[in-house]
Amino acid sequence: MILVDSNIPMYLVGASHPHKLDAQRLLESALSGGERLVTDAEVLQEICHRYVAIKRREAIQPAFDAIIGVVDEVLPIERTDVEHARDALLRYQTLSARDALHIAVMAHHDITRLMSFDRGFDSYPGIKRLA
């Protein structure tokens, strides 16, 4: 099982960028390999937050369509996930709050692989980032 981060659909629907083709290649490889892809509710919130912040609300729906179209499930955020994220933030000083929440959801669901271009995950042990 692989958790798909928000930057994957955002590169897919965004303007020309070197990661646009990389994101497409990663998804195609995972899907053709029969991998189970999931995301979490925080990823959907990140998409909303980012596009509102850069005044591109019209990009929210295409990004949602891109990710919902490839994942098998959107995992919820539970209280225990937030508590796990808090603990990770106190232990790993370079970890962002959003990344800590994804890591907590991954731990909750025994997921060790993450599709993301965010190098912030690299400092956390036990996570294999696919980029």
From Swiss-Prot:
GO terms for cellular component: extracellular region. GO terms for molecular function: magnesium ion binding; RNA nuclease activity. Mg(2+) binds at D5, D99. Keywords: Hydrolase, Magnesium, Metal-binding, Nuclease, Secreted, Toxin-antitoxin system. Its EC number is 3.1.-.-. PANTHER family: RIBONUCLEASE VAPC13. This is Ribonuclease VapC13. It comes from Mycobacterium tuberculosis (strain ATCC 25618 / H37Rv). The lineage of its organism: Bacteria, Bacillati, Actinomycetota, Actinomycetes, Mycobacteriales. The gene is vapC13.
